[in-house]
Amino acid sequence: GHAGKVTWAIEQGAVGGVPLTGFAFGCASNADAFMPSPSQFTYFQGGGFDVSFLSFLEVDRQGNVNVSKLGKKPYLTAGCGGFVDITANARKIVFAGLFEAAATLVLSADGLKVEKPGKFSKMVDEVEHVTFSGRRARETGQDVLYVTERCVMRITDDGLVATEINDSARFVALRV
């Protein structure tokens, strides 16, 4: 594993330790230090880190990402938060999330399987709101990956290209 080789930095100020999820999102267990949030953002804005790991609401064929607006349920998002600061100067970005919202996955000896398809695809023709620009990422030379349970995609001059496909995950239709 990579334990001891990774130091997590969270926008709320925690450095090191293990990031917490759910209601405790933004906190960390056994953090090495706590920075004032403005200092943490100065660090992020300066690109002082190797890789950013973030999630997404929607991704489109050009690599644009929406994390800040979900028209049908605007109460589910609180805006972009520190997302723009974290992605603007990152040399490498890994977006990770489910290919379909609310899909049920099962991990077995045979691999990862989609037990129940999601309610809707998070891979869309055009995102509702551009919080991260795929075009800007290409222009600035950022290395961007999109990781889902079904495939890994990389941003290219032609848009998203699947570079790895999970053979055990049942595909409905990959229209990216």
Describe every region a protein language model picked out.
Residues 5-7, 50-51:
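Beta-sheet entry/capping signal
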Residues 6-14, 96-97:
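Short internal beta-strands
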Residues 16-176:
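Conserved phosphate- and dinucleotide-binding cores of soluble alpha/beta proteins
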